[in-house]
A protein has these predicted regions:
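Conserved beta-strand segments that form the floor/walls of ligand-binding pockets within enzyme
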Residues: 35
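ATP/NTP-dependent adenylation/nucleotidyl-transfer catalytic domains that generate, transfer
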Residues: 1-32, 44, 48-51, 56-59, ...
Length: 264
């Protein structure tokens, strides 16, 4: 009754493709740039981008750093080659190190991790500008809702094709589109620092996270009822709800005070 509805993968694919085609046409753009991390979200986004505008109009960028698992870098380039798209690999460490040498801040793991995401997005937008392409985002609904992305980093894009799909939906659509099994099977990770995985940071599996988010956000069920239904603590539910509220600013245009309150 309160489970996430089963995804109609065929219709979802077609709806996303039509959405992407419309947005590229409206912007009078010539194609799409996609950052290829080697993970399931960017891989699925690249598959959909190729279906929407053709592989000849998709440009992929693989941007490893010293904390990027070798497997992820190899998967990023492998996906570009599998899809037959033009791509470029740019290691970001020289840019990162120059920035850190100027700012002289080298011991803030979170700030440095976010900086990596912002460096990558600057590179992506540079190529998008030069090619008259749109930046194709790779975020999913689960991560967007809890703010599990870097503001003005991996959260910056022109369109977000899979942004309304929960992470569990992403897996279903990826299987339907025949994304390579090794990418589907490996643990999601951002690679912003060593030995990092998404689920460790979030504090629960995506499966449980999605169940909480669907019930609290889509169905508007109260915390106590969700906790009882999922056999977890109310604190676990409230923590996710709090994260959703606390991170709403990440998806909004910066707010300003209303001029009507300032006039005489």
């Amino acid at each position: 009754m309160n489970e996430i509805p089963k995804l109609d993968v065929e219709k979802t694919k077609n709806d996303i493709i039509e959405f992407v085609q419309n947005k590229v046409s409206e912007a009078n753009a010539d194609g799409l740039v996609v950052g290829l991390s080697g993970g399931i979200d960017s891989t699925l986004s690249a598959f959909l981008a190729c279906e929407a505008v053709g592989k000849e109009n998709v440009f992929g960028i693989v941007m490893p750093s010293t904390t990027t698992p070798t497997e992820d870098k190899l998967h990023g380039t492998a996906i570009a080659q599998l899809l037959g798209i033009e791509y470029k690999e740019i290691a970001i460490d020289s840019i990162l190190n120059e920035f850190l040498s100027v700012t002289q801040i080298e011991d803030d793991k979170l700030a440095i991790g976010n900086l990596k995401a912002r460096i990558r997005m600057s590179i992506i937008y540079f190529y998008a500008n030069s090619k008259n392409y749109l930046v194709c985002g790779t975020g999913n609904r689960s991560e967007i809702l809890i703010g599990y992305f870097t503001k003005h980093g991996d959260g910056a894009c022109d369109i977000e094709p899979i942004g309304d799909l929960y992470k569990t939906d992403v897996y279903e659509l990826a299987k339907f589109l025949e994304v390579p099994q090794e990418i589907i099977n490996k643990p999601p990770r951002a690679g912003l620092w060593n030995n990092q995985t998404d689920e460790d940071e979030i504090g629960m599996t995506y499966e449980l996270l999605d169940k909480i988010l669907y019930r609290s956000t889509d169905k508007k069920i109260d915390s106590k009822s969700i906790a009882e239904e999922l056999d977890i603590s109310v604190d676990e539910v409230d923590d996710i709800i709090t994260r959703v509220e606390r991170n709403k600013h990440k998806t909004k245009v910066p707010e300003s005070p209303k001029k009507t309150t300032m006039v005489i």
